[in-house]
Regions:
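Short Gly/Thr/Asp-enriched flexible loops that form oxyanion-binding sites at enzyme active sites
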Residues: 50, 80, 99-113, 145-148
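Glycine/serine-rich anion-binding loops at beta->alpha junctions
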Residues: 87-104, 137-143
Length: 229
C-alpha cells in the first residue's frame, strides 16, 4: 500500500514501514540530529531500524534515551543542554507523548537565551525554533501539533502547561508497525482513547467536511478492531 502524504503544515506521512525511511525524510532539514528515543524501543528492535536508516543516508546523530516514565524539567534541561552543545540541525523524537513532549520543548527553547524555568514561570518564547520531526508510536498525543505542552516542574512536582511557538513540528511520521512495542492491554487502552479523540473531533465546532470524513473512518476502523479483539 502506498504512503498517504498530507501536504500541509506540518507534513504528515502515513504508511507501513515509513519510519524505516526516516533518513530520507529528514535530509530536508539538515544532516546532524539529536534523536530522542523511548528506551522501551530498544527491546522491540525499532531503535535499531531508526539508527540504520539514518546511517544509510549519512545523517550524523546521537541518541538521548534517558527518559523515565514521568520526565520532568530536569530531564528536559539535560536534553536541551546536550542539544545546544552538539550544535544540531534538528531533533527527531521517536516514542510516545512523553518523548515527543521533550522534543517540542527542546526545539522551542534551543535558540532562547533564558533558561527553561523562566518559561515554566510564565514567559513566552520568542526566538526561532529548531526543526522537529516526530515519529509517534501511538496516535494519542493531543499536544503534537499544538502551541503548548505539559511538563512537570521539578521544583514543585506540579504539572504545568508550557507555552510554545506555533508550527514547531515540521514532519510527523505515523507507522502502524511501531505499535508492536505495545502490550495487548496498552493497545486496547490506546484504541479507546483514540476513539474518544475521534468522537471529540467529529462533534467539535471547528470540524469540517474533511475532518468529519477522517473521524468517521477512524471510528469505523477502531470499532471494527475492538470487535475483533
Amino acid at each position: 500500500m502506498a504512503d498517504f502524504v498530507f501536504k500541509i503544515s506540518p507534513n504528515i506521512i502515513l504508511g507501513s514501514y515509513s519510519a524505516s525511511r526516516i533518513g530520507q525524510f529528514v535530509q530536508e532539514w539538515g544532516t546532524k540530529f539529536m534523536v530522542l528515543l523511548d528506551p522501551i524501543l530498544h527491546e522491540s528492535g525499532i531503535s535499531a531500524k531508526i539508527k540504520q536508516s539514518l546511517t544509510d543516508r549519512n545523517v550524523d546523530f546521537f541518541i538521548f534515551d534517558e527518559i523515565p516514565n514521568a520526565p520532568d524539567s530536569k530531564v528536559v534541561s539535560q536534553a536541551l543542554k546536550l542539544a545546544k552543545e552538539a550544535h544540531i540541525h534538528g531533533i527527531i523524537a521517536v516514542g510516545g507523548p512523553k518523548t515527543c513532549s521533550i522534543g517540542r520543548v527542546v526545539a522551542s527553547l534551543y535558540y532562547e537565551v533564558l533558561d527553561l524555568y523562566t518559561f515554566l514561570d510564565g514567559s513566552t518564547p520568542t526566538a526561532g525554533t529548531l526543526p522537529l520531526i516526530c515519529v509517534p508510536t501511538t496516535m494519542r498525543d493531543i499536544f503534537l501539533f499544538s502551541d503548548s505542552t505539559p511538563l512537570i516542574d521539578a521544583r514543585s512536582r506540579q504539572l504545568k502547561i508550557l507555552k510554545l511557538q506555533n508550527n514547531i513540528t515540521k514532519l510527523s511520521i505515523f507507522d502502524p508497525n511501531l505499535s508492536v512495542s505495545l502490550t495487548d492491554n496498552q493497545v486496547s487502552s490506546v484504541s479507546l482513547e483514540t476513539l474518544c479523540m475521534a468522537v471529540e473531533s467529529y462533534i467539535s465546532q471547528k470540524s469540517n467536511f474533511f475532518s468529519d470524513t477522517i473521524a468517521e473512518k477512524a471510528m469505523e476502523l477502531i470499532i471494527s478492531s475492538l470487535d475483533g479483539a
